[in-house]
Amino acid sequence: MDGNHNKFWSLALSIAMMLTATAASAVEENFDALKPGTLPDDWTCGVTGKGSPVWKVETDTSAPSKPNVLKQTGSGTFPWCVKQLVRITDGFVEVKFKPLGGREDQAGGLVWRFKDGDTYYIARANALENNVSLYHVEKGRRITIKYVHAPVTTNQWHTLRVEFSGKAINVIFDGKRYLGLENDQITGAGAVGVWTKADSVTAFDDFSYGGQ
């Protein structure tokens, strides 16, 4: 009995230490200390494919953490904005986003294991299609892994989170896990960031990430 008791507490302590370490490594950015019309110095923005995306910090009175958000108002095949100097192999990335408009798409997404504009993973939610999707990009080509129906509302804040470890990928939207699977197309450390598609006008806030 004592042996089992000790094993239980040893396991509980190990789990607590793991959770503490993960929480300690988490970083959150809300863009509120930045001047509207600017970009954070440590973010790099671009596009996979063609187009002219426009990323900048703007004031938004509806922001989950007021007053500022990071907003994409231009258009391009797949616009992205990443924390280029962050390198995470296994961990999580999360953001609150609000799809504001777009005739072709109204998407907000996350990227991780981002090597460059041609190689990375994407999880995204789309208000026009009402779904959550998982992709990987290789040689600049977006490849669908899986998508599922999900209620995504325009002009409403949503939370998108991805947890990734080895081959395992879990995509959580508004607190519910919609995708849980294994994929090993992209391995090793990479940057993390946010993503849109086509003419999506999307606001982002409370971007957070952490490594295991």
Residue ranges and their predicted role:
Residues 38-69, 76-77:
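Extracellular glycan-recognition surfaces and repeat-rich motifs
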Residues 30, 186-212:
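Ligand-recognition surfaces built from glycine- and aromatic
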Residues 36, 72-133, 138:
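Secretory/extracellular carbohydrate-interaction modules
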Residues 25-47, 205:
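Extracellular carbohydrate-recognition regions
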Residues 31, 93-95, 155-171:
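Short tryptophan-centered beta-strand motifs in secreted/extracellular beta-sheet-rich domains
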Residues 138-159:
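Short, aromatic/His-centered strand-loop micro-motif at the edge of beta-sheets
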Residues 10-20:
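Bacterial N-terminal signal peptides
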Residues 172-193:
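Short, solvent-exposed beta-strand-to-loop segments that form ligand-recognition rims
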